[in-house]
Curated annotation (Swiss-Prot):
Keywords: Disulfide bond, Ion channel impairing toxin, Knottin, Secreted, Signal, Toxin. GO terms for cellular component: extracellular region. Belongs to the neurotoxin 10 (Hwtx-1) family. 51 (Hntx-8) subfamily. Hntx-8 sub-subfamily. InterPro entries: Huwentoxin-1 (IPR011696), Huwentoxin_CS1 (IPR013140). Residues 1-24 form the signal peptide. It comes from Cyriopagopus hainanus (Chinese bird spider). The presence of a 'disulfide through disulfide knot' structurally defines this protein as a knottin. Expressed by the venom gland. Its main location: secreted. This is U3-theraphotoxin-Hhn1a 19. Ion channel inhibitor.
Length: 87
């Protein structure tokens, strides 16, 4: 009877240990993609958006002039592509 109790205890302890190891491994796997994506999409100082003197496509053109290739829409006050049907 003593051997049966010891065997059950060791089996239970082994299952608990297996659960802990699997849980730790799974949590590391969940963190890995997050770390990889954050390193890939990290904002670098070289790639920050620069402040322009002109407004780009679909930007407000009330105070800024539109960049070359765009015109200020008289109706919406946005920089849009020039087209013959626009007034």
């Amino acid at each position: 009877m003593v051997n049966m109790k010891a065997l059950m205890f060791l089996t239970f302890a082994g299952l608990v240990l297996l659960f802990v190891v699997c849980y730790a491994s799974e949590s590391e796997e969940k963190e890995f993609p997050k770390e990889m994506l954050s390193s890939i999409f990290a904002v670098d100082n070289d790639f920050k958006q620069e402040e322009r003197d002109c407004a780009g496509y679909m930007r407000e053109c009330k105070e800024k002039l539109c960049c070359s290739g765009y015109v200020c829409s008289s109706r919406w006050k946005w920089c849009v592509l020039p087209a013959p049907w626009r007034r």
